[in-house]
Design a protein with these regions (language model features):
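A noncatalytic interaction/capping subdomain that flanks phosphate/NTP-handling catalytic cores
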Residues: 11-229
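Classical Sec-dependent N-terminal signal peptides that target proteins to the secretory pathway
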Residues: 3-8
Length: 230
C-alpha cells in the first residue's frame, strides 16, 4: 500500500534517454537501438505525485483507497530477490567485490539483457524521474530512474530527493536505472539464474531490473550504488 493524496490535472510529456552511448560494436548497437526506441516509445518525464497516481489508476496498476491512498499489488514477488542480483565483472569491480557472496555477470550478457529490455519496451508508455540520492549537499548522486509502471515512479520519487528547478534544468545523471517488470530474463541468453534479474554495471553507470513488480528493488539498487561509491 502506498499512501498519497489524489488530484486530477493535466499531464506534460517529454522524451528522455536512459543509457550513455559507449564505444565498441555491442555498445554501438545498443546506442542505435535506443535511438529507435526513443522514436516509438512514449516516456513521461518527472511527473509529480498527483500525475503519477492518475497514470497508475488509468493503467490499471492500482486503485484508490480510503483517504486517497493508492493501493497496488506487486504480483508474484512481494519482497527483494537477493539471489537474482548480479554485478558486472569489470576493471573497476574485479578486485573490489566479494565474488564468493555476489553473483557476477559478463559485459556481453549485460549488453544483451539491455538490448532485449529496450526491444521489449518499444511502443510502451514509460516514466522517468530525475532524482538525487543522499541529503548531503556535498556528497550525492544524480539518479535517473526509468520505469514501466507509474506507481514504481511514484515510489522512487517519494523516497529520493526531488531536485530544485535550477538543479533539474542542469541535471546530468551520474547513474541510470531501467526497470521493466513485464520482461523476463533468460538464464541461457542473459547469464543469470532466473526470470528475475537485477544487474549493475558500474562502468556503464546503469542498473537493469526485470521480472519483478516489487518496487523496493529500485530503492535497494540506489543503496547499493551509495554503499559502493561513497
Amino acid at each position: 500500500i502506498f499512501n498519497c493524496f489524489f488530484l486530477l490535472f493535466m499531464i506534460n510529456q517529454n522524451t528522455v534517454t536512459f543509457c550513455n552511448s559507449q564505444t565498441g560494436n555491442d555498445s554501438l548497437w545498443i546506442y542505435f537501438a535506443e535511438q529507435e526506441y526513443r522514436k516509438i516509445t512514449t516516456i513521461l518525464k518527472n511527473l509529480n505525485e498527483f500525475e503519477l497516481i492518475e497514470e497508475a489508476i488509468k493503467n490499471g496498476e492500482g486503485k484508490l483507497g480510503k483517504g486517497g491512498s493508492l493501493i497496488v499489488f506487486t504480483g508474484e514477488k512481494t519482497g527483494r530477490s537477493p539471489k537474482d542480483k548480479h554485478v558486472v565483472k569489470e576493471k573497476n569491480t574485479e578486485d573490489k567485490i566479494w565474488w564468493e557472496n555476489n553473483r557476477s555477470m559478463s559485459t556481453a550478457h549485460f549488453d544483451t539483457l539491455h538490448m532485449d529490455m529496450i526491444e521489449h519496451q518499444k511502443g510502451k508508455r514509460c516514466y522517468t524521474q530525475a532524482l538525487q540520492a543522499s541529503m548531503n549537499t556535498d556528497e550525492f548522486f544524480n539518479i535517473e530512474v526509468t520505469t514501466e509502471l507509474a506507481w514504481h515512479s511514484l515510489f522512487i520519487r517519494h523516497l529520493l530527493k526531488v531536485p530544485s528547478t535550477e538543479s533539474l534544468n542542469n541535471f546530468k545523471p551520474d547513474f541510470k536505472i531501467l526497470n521493466c517488470p513485464s520482461f523476463f530474463s533468460d538464464p541461457n541468453r542473459h547469464g543469470c539464474v532466473s526470470k528475475t534479474t537485477i544487474a549493475i554495471s558500474f562502468e556503464k553507470k546503469l542498473v537493469l531490473i526485470c521480472g519483478t513488480g516489487y518496487a523496493g528493488e529500485n530503492k535497494k539498487s540506489v543503496f547499493t550504488l551509495l554503499n559502493f561509491l561513497l
